[in-house]
Amino acid sequence: GNDMRHTDLSSINLSHAKLIDNDMRWIDMSYADLRYAKLTGNDMTSTDMRYTYTRDTCFEDCIIPMACPSDGAFIGWKKARHCGEAVLVKLLIPEDAKRSSATGRKCRCDKAKVVEILTMKGNIEVEFAVSVYNDSFVYKKGKVVCEPNFCEDRFKECAEGIHFFIDRKEAENYLP
């Protein structure tokens, strides 16, 4: 393989490319097109893949650390709606929850406890919120929410699961 560390590949079209057994640490691949590419056995630790197109990309045997902790309970944040207004939901992802992240910062889990729900303006606490994508998925303070159809494939970023970010600011800035 090749030493590709610190290379700027932002906005590059690598669709259908084959990149095998390379050292791809600290590469900027933001906005790159990797659709249908075969990336096998690459070390992609600390690679910036924000807004990268990865439809049907093969990441077989690649080293891509998850954005969320692989073990233990932790806090996550997501954007939802309360009476038509954007709110932030603070989630406690339990130790036994399934969790994943693809190549970016957005994470998913199969269950979480709703710790608090805050308005975007004024940080006022509210009792419930609904999903931005599914009005029947309701978050209630103090209750556990579950996604029974959680998709185990971590590289399907927008698949079934409770979507969240580790960092509150990322959730605040997220535009669904």
PLM regions: where:
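Short linear sequence elements within intrinsically disordered, low-complexity coil regions
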Residues: 36, 64, 142-144, 169-170
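Non-catalytic interaction/regulatory modules that flank or connect domains
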Residues: 70-152, 159
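Tandem repeat scaffolds
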Residues: 1-86, 99
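Intrinsically disordered, low-complexity segments enriched in glycine/proline and serine/threonine
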Residues: 21, 41, 109, 146, ...
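Extended catalytic/binding region for NAD+/ADP-ribose chemistry, centered on the ART fold
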Residues: 153-175
